[in-house]
Structure formats: C-alpha cells, structure tokens
Amino acid sequence: MLKEFREFAMKGNVVDLAVGIIIGAAFGAIVSSLVGDIIMPLIGAITGGLDFSNYFTGLSSAVTATNLADAKKQGAVLAWGNFLTLTLNFLIVAFVLFVVIRFMNRLKRNDAEKPAPKPNPEQELLTEIRDILKTMRR
C-alpha cells in the first residue's frame, strides 16, 4: 500500500499540481500586495484619499464605529469596500492567468506547426537499405 501511494505521489501530474499550488499561493500574496498596497492607494489618491477596504454599511443602529474593525465588534456590517478590493484582486489574478495560459498555448501551437526535421544523409541511406532488404526478402 505504501508503495502504491509513493508511485501515485511521484507521478508527474501530482508533483506538478503540488508545485502549482505552492506557486499559486505565493503569487496570490504578491497580487494581494499589489492590490492592497499599490492599486487601491492610487485609486484612493485619485478619489481624494478614500480607503475602500474600510468602507462598510452597518446593518443595525448599534453600529456607530467609523472603521471596519470596530464596526465588526459592534454588530453585523456589510464590508462592501473589502469586497471591492477582493474583487479587484480576483480580476487581476484571472487576467494574469489568462495571459499566461494564452502565452503557453501560443508556444504549444508554434511547436506543433514546426515541420519535422529533414533526415540527414546517413538516415536516408539507411532507410533505402532497409527498403531494399525488405523487397529482397519477399
């Protein structure tokens, strides 16, 4: 049973999947930083210093706080600014994946379109000898 598991775990697809998950997690952190630390502050600067991640709507009259963390302690809130930030994060990840997959497909297509290399003179001679030997055996 251990041998079967080792064979399964060492198959190319499983290892590729594990590497992809690890790289994806690291890439997710980079995109989160890009959105949270660069894009959203730029959008905030353009819109007059607004911080979208701190926008919320309280669902009860008990919510009187002015920042999201304190508002969550007071009661239920719709954290729509955080949702907006995460949606932008998702769109960036989806776009980057689209570009990467498109690039990979283009590379595969270029490899498939390349003609087979011409055989060298030795290979042609060996092929002729093989064909002659086949006809002689008949």
Swiss-Prot record:
Q: Where in the cell is it found?
A: Cell inner membrane
Which Pfam families does this UniProt record tie to the protein?
MscL
Which positions, given as ranges, span the membrane?
A: 19-39, 81-101
Family annotation (Gene3D superfamilies):
Large-conductance mechanosensitive channel, MscL, domain 1
Q: Which UniProt keywords apply?
A: Cell inner membrane, Cell membrane, Ion channel, Ion transport, Membrane, Transmembrane, Transmembrane helix, Transport
Topological category with respect to the lipid bilayer: Multi-pass membrane protein
GO cellular component term, pick one: plasma membrane
The UniProt GO MF terms for this protein read: mechanosensitive monoatomic ion channel activity
Indicate the principal place this protein occupies in or around the cell.
Answer: membrane
Function, as annotated: Channel that opens in response to stretch forces in the membrane lipid bilayer. May participate in the regulation of osmotic pressure changes within the cell.
Family named by the database record = Belongs to the MscL family.
Family matches, as HAMAP family:
MscL (MF_00115)
| Subunit and interaction comment | Homopentamer.
Annotated protein name in UniProt? Large-conductance mechanosensitive channel
Organism encoding this protein = Rhodopseudomonas palustris (strain BisB18)
Starting at the broadest rank, the lineage of the source organism is: Bacteria, Pseudomonadati, Pseudomonadota, Alphaproteobacteria, Hyphomicrobiales
